[in-house]
C-alpha cells in the first residue's frame, strides 16, 4: 500500500502545484503552455492536455489574467469544459469560449474579424481568443490568444509554442482566423 500512498501524495502535491498564482506576478498576461508538466499529462477527453488542451489553456490565460486568480489553471478549465459538455472528438467547442469565461465571472462576446476592432479592444485591455486553421500556428485547428497591440503589431500567445509567441502584423495571420472572442472584467 506504500506505492499507492506515494501515488496519492504525488498527485496531491501536483494539484497543489497546479495553481498558477505565481505566473500572474506582473501586469502582463502569462504565456501558459498546454504541455507544461504541471498539467500536460492530465487527460482532457481521450487525449492528454499536451496534445489537445489549447482551448482550455487559452481560456485559462485570459480568465486568470483578468481575475488575477491562479485557481483558473488550464486543467481547471479543461475539467470544466469536459464536465459541462464542451469537449468532443473534434476538440473544444466554440461555445466554451463564451460560457467557460462567464462561469468564471468574465464577460465574453464574439468579435468580427476587423483589424481596427481588434486594435480597439486590445488597447482597452480586452484580450482576444482566436480559433485558427492551418497556417503559422497549426497543421489542423488551434486556439491562440491576442493579448496586446503595440507599434502596429499584435502580441500572440500560442499555448503550444514559446517560439511562436511574439508580435505579428495582422496580415501575417488574419487569413487563418476562423473566429474570435473578446473578454472583459466588466460587462460589454
Give the residues covered by each predicted segment.
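Extracytoplasmic/periplasmic, Sec-exported soluble proteins
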Residues: 46-55, 69, 89-93, 110, ...
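Mid-length scaffold segments of soluble, non-membrane domains
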Residues: 72-73, 79-113
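Active-site-adjacent structural segments surrounding the nucleophilic cysteine of cysteine proteases
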Residues: 5, 9-85
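Active-site-adjacent substructure of cysteine-protease-like catalytic cores
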Residues: 107-155, 165, 187-188
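Alpha-helix boundary recognition
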Residues: 82, 102, 122-123, 174
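Noncatalytic regulatory segments and standalone regulatory/sensor domains
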Residues: 10-27, 32, 149-188
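Extracytoplasmic/secreted envelope proteins and their assembly/folding machinery
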Residues: 55-63, 74, 78, 94, ...
Amino acid at each position: 500500500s506504500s506505492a499507492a500512498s506515494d501515488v496519492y501524495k504525488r498527485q496531491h502535491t501536483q494539484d497543489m502545484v497546479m495553481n498558477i498564482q505565481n505566473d500572474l506576478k506582473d501586469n502582463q498576461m502569462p504565456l501558459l503552455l498546454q504541455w507544461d508538466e504541471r498539467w500536460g499529462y492530465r487527460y482532457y477527453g481521450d487525449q492528454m492536455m499536451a496534445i489537445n488542451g489549447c482551448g482550455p489553456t487559452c481560456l485559462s490565460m485570459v480568465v486568470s489574467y483578468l481575475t488575477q486568480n491562479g485557481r483558473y489553471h488550464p486543467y481547471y478549465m479543461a475539467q470544466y469544459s469536459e464536465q459541462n459538455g464542451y469537449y468532443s472528438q473534434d476538440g473544444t467547442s466554440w461555445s466554451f469560449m463564451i460560457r467557460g469565461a462567464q462561469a468564471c465571472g468574465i464577460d465574453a462576446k464574439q468579435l468580427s474579424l476587423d483589424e481596427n476592432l481588434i486594435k480597439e479592444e486590445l488597447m482597452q485591455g480586452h484580450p482576444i481568443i482566436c480559433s485558427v486553421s492551418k497556417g503559422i500556428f497549426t497543421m489542423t485547428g488551434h486556439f491562440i490568444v491576442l493579448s496586446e497591440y503595440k507599434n502596429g503589431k499584435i502580441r500572440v500567445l500560442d499555448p503550444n509554442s514559446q517560439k511562436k509567441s511574439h508580435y505579428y502584423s495582422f496580415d501575417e495571420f488574419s487569413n487563418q482566423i476562423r473566429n474570435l472572442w473578446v473578454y472583459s472584467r466588466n460587462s460589454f
